[in-house]
């Protein structure tokens, strides 16, 4: 399939009415959430993928808002028809985080109690607060299962938090260039950036919205952070020790080197699109992020149910491969389904935004390698062997079933009854279940590819397969609708 753009898109808004409880104990009223969607939600609402943005990102992840836009959304290379997050197949959703400044309630928003911007009176938030707000949006859309949650950097933290806070909702998760526990070094860089903002006289205790914003402090904070997004190799390649002007030093305090001019440009342009107070709150949320429990990351991740893909960047020194491997170790201890990939790149941390070829390849392979467990229905109505046909018919009618597995007292599969079997029993005046049920039942295993199960169903002209574990205990069922929805 050729890769195309999602085209012209619009930002949508949802208001969470009433008071919203935050992890720190405070509440916020009537939170407004900015979000964008790409692709179509299927009838079963089972194809949704939530994309979580990084520290200074926003909801505009793909497409353009108008034909005049110079740049598309920040992950346009990954989201769209034929791309890893294929909008011909998935319903992709991205929202601006709580505390942000791109449409979602944050420090620059009006406090309904005062009619003025919150400023520094905005309550301190956490990654979990961000995720809880996203959950309310998912609920509003009627989505009860996320096919995947995907995010890089701070977006990876949100992805992990989703898997921990709402394990039953997330089928798959992709964590890119991130960590499960913010390190002292990462906290230190954030602290220096916050101090640069707070030290700017124009910050004015966070109350600057009717005056001059603290552009110098915010620009410096961005310059500091941007260094951590690059690698030594990429800076050597891009700038080396090349001078900004001429071939000799100026021997004054002006900027001599190209790398300095580049950082200043990054800082200055950043002040035109981001709020200084939002930067304070977002970095604080990152500092607080720690999914370990009693010092053990394995304990903190023990309830994760999603199939996980953890991706690191070889040259990333902000969230180095070490941090990704610690996530994998924490998941492996409890035997969670996790795979790990390293992206070879000299771009540093920003490679998750720049290495679109590798990122597309790895994510596409992970999302499309669908197993039976990814799509099976886990809550299956059953009937015990020895039950009457009348009982079976009643269960099938009340649950609107065409297939009813028969199990023994240990939950092991011993047969299956279909709606055709019930019709046959009525015609032949049978009363015993064992006279009509199929005993030699074709089954599937949870870890086998869905394609293999689909071929088995087609070969035998059946429309459902019970899913069993290694001891033949029933753990789920898949039917032709599940197959058609996924592989057409």
Swiss-Prot record:
Its EC number is 2.3.1.31. GO terms for molecular function: homoserine O-acetyltransferase activity. NCBIfam families: homoserO_Ac_trn, PRK00175.1. Residues 376-433, 437-488 form the CBS domain. GO terms for biological process: homoserine metabolic process; methionine biosynthetic process. The lineage of its organism: Archaea, Methanobacteriati, Methanobacteriota, Stenosarchaea group, Methanomicrobia. Pfam families: Abhydrolase_1, CBS. It is found in: Cytoplasm. Homodimer. Substrate binds at residues 222, 350. One of its GO terms (cellular component) is cytoplasm. It comes from Methanococcoides burtonii (strain DSM 6242 / NBRC 107633 / OCM 468 / ACE-M). Residues 47-355 form the AB hydrolase-1 domain. SMART domains: CBS. This is Homoserine O-acetyltransferase. Belongs to the AB hydrolase superfamily. MetX family. The gene is metXA. Its main location: cytoplasm. It catalyses: L-homoserine + acetyl-CoA = O-acetyl-L-homoserine + CoA. SUPFAM superfamilies: alpha/beta-Hydrolases (SSF53474), CBS-domain pair (SSF54631).
């Amino acid at each position: 399939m050729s890769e195309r753009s999602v085209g012209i898109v619009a930002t949508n808004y949802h208001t969470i009415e009433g008071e919203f409880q935050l992890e720190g104990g405070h509440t916020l009223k009537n939170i407004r959430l900015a979000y964008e969607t790409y692709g179509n939600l299927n009838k079963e609402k089972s194809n949704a993928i939530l994309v979580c943005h990084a520290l200074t990102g926003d909801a505009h992840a793909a497409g353009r808002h108008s034909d005049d836009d110079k740049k598309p959304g920040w992950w346009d290379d990954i989201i769209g028809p034929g791309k890893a997050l294929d909008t011909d197949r998935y319903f992709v959703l991205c929202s601006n985080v709580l505390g942000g400044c791109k449409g979602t309630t944050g420090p620059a928003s009006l406090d309904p109690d005062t009619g003025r911007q919150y400023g520094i009176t905005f309550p301190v938030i956490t990654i979990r607060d961000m995720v809880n707000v996203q959950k309310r949006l998912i609920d509003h859309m009627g989505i009860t299962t996320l096919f995947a949650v995907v995010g890089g950097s701070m977006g990876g933290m949100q992805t992990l938090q989703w898997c921990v806070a709402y394990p039953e909702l997330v089928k798959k998760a992709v964590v890119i260039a991130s960590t499960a526990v913010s390190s002292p070094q990462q906290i230190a860089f954030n602290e220096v950036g916050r101090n640069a903002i707070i030290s700017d006289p124009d910050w004015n205790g966070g109350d600057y919205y009717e005056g001059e914003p603290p552009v110098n402090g915010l620009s410096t904070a961005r310059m500091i952070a941007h260094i951590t997004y690059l690698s030594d190799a990429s800076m050597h390649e891009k700038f080396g020790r090349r001078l900004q002007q001429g071939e000799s030093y100026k021997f004054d305090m002006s900027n001599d080197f190209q790398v300095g001019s580049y950082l200043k440009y990054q800082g200055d342009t950043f002040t035109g699109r981001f709020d200084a107070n939002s930067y304070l709150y977002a970095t604080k949320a990152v500092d607080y992020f720690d999914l370990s429990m009693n010092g053990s990351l394995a304990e903190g991740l023990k309830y994760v149910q999603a199939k996980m893909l953890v991706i690191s960047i070889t040259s990333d020194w902000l969230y180095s491969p070490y941090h990704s491997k610690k996530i994998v170790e924490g998941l492996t201890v409890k035997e969670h389904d996790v795979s790990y990939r390293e992206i070879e790149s000299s771009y540093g941390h920003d490679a998750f935004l720049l290495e679109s070829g590798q990122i597309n390849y790895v994510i596409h392979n992970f999302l499309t390698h669908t197993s039976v467990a990814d799509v099976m229905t886990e809550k299956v109505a059953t009937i015990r062997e020895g039950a009457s046909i009348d009982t079976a018919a009643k269960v099938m009618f009340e649950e609107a079933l065409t297939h009813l597995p028969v199990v023994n007292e240990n939950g092991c599969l011993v047969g299956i009854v279909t709606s055709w079997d019930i019709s046959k029993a009525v015609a032949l005046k049978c009363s015993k279940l064992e006279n009509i049920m199929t005993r030699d039942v074709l089954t599937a295993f949870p870890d086998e590819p869905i394609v293999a199960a689909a071929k088995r169903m087609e070969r035998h002209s059946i429309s459902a397969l019970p899913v069993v574990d290694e001891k033949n205990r029933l753990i789920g069922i898949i039917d032709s609708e599940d197959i058609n929805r996924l592989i057409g």
